[in-house]
Swiss-Prot record:
Belongs to the adenylate kinase family. It comes from Geobacillus thermodenitrificans (strain NG80-2). SUPFAM superfamilies: P-loop containing nucleoside triphosphate hydrolases (SSF52540). Keywords: ATP-binding, Cytoplasm, Kinase, Metal-binding, Nucleotide biosynthesis, Nucleotide-binding, Transferase, Zinc. Pfam families: ADK, ADK_lid. GO terms for molecular function: adenylate kinase activity; ATP binding; zinc ion binding. This is Adenylate kinase.
Amino acid sequence: MNLVLMGLPGAGKGTQAEKIVETYGIPHISTGDMFRAAMKEGTPLGLQAKEYIDRGDLVPDEVTIGIVRERLSKDDCQNGFLLDGFPRTVAQAEALEAMLAEIGRKLDYVIHIDVRQDVLMERLTGRRICRNCGATYHLVFHPPAQPGVCDKCGGELYQRPDDNEATVANRLEVNTKQMKPLLDFYEQKGYLRHINGEQEMEKVFSDIRELLGGLTR
């Protein structure tokens, strides 16, 4: 099964990726992991990517696509893969289509974990961290026994600057704009499937499992 997983920050993509990989035994391929592995192995493309990353620049499409091609040709991808964080643009999506066609494969599904903006805001702005021991809480999902105080060490809880409303709203807006053309592209191709990410974590995975059931029979 050849899958792409998509979702905005806070949609629970990481959790569902873990469950898919564990259940179906396919590798979870994230852009960050791919870059790190290619740089560690010292491949020509990995070294090129390192130059851009060290300068704080975006890695150009041709380098990213080359690294994805190298990764998908490895033995552990023969029975499928779960791509996460790639593609990010329609140009990358088209390159992925061409790359898979070269090796006689195609995507099965692009799974979009769909969560409304207001729910994402609540999830992302509710995080609180202990200044003393680093324990993490959430005002709604995992609140401390006493507001503002760490259960473990009694330290003060604070909100990280990048978890405040303005920063989170901006992050979601940027990601939404970037993702929309990609969702439209995969909708037209017939690969896109929306999963309601506002349900309990287990129900979200149950819906994904139901979708993927036809591929494993």
